[in-house]
Amino acid sequence: VSDYLRGEQIMELKGTKTEKNLMEAFAGESMARNKYTYFASVAKKEGYEQLAAIFEETAGNEKEHAKMWFKALCGGSIPDTLTCLDMAASGENEEWTDMYPRMAAEAKEEGFTQLAALFTMVGQIEKEHEARYRALAANLKEGKVFAREEQQVWVCRNCGYTYIGKSAPLKCPVCAHPQSYFELKARNY
């Protein structure tokens, strides 16, 4: 987490007040980061570049604070990518199966029909997010991130080089970036 906390014995947080406080600190810092990013955008549009830069700098600070609390909640470090994909899918599932339907029902009950509709529509987006994370996790488990059974068009996300083959190149022949920069080329135009 930080040098300050490294010497602390890792204790079981589950169910403690400290766990609750870490979750509150993580949520608070995360929300502050987003708000300050929005505030920076407004300041920039209104012609206040210095104020925008200060909001952006502070947002970056809040991001690091949130990361520190999140790491503490995760036992000292952020988990591996597969675990992160599973955590993300579970979070998205909770949002579209429980949180947004409940919020939509409550908003409708209180007469906020437009907000109820927005809660419902965002819930559908979260359902798509869950599906995407689950598909990505399956690709990772099955070794299909950079290899497929049939020829594909792969594109380097750094320089745009395209390659046709069953696997992405180990290294881009144009910019020398590693295979990790390749993805399947998608055409949406």
In which residue ranges do the predicted regions lie?
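Intrinsic-disorder-associated, low-complexity terminal segments enriched in Asp/Asn/His/Tyr and depleted
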Residues: 3-4
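Non-heme di-metal
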Residues: 7-189
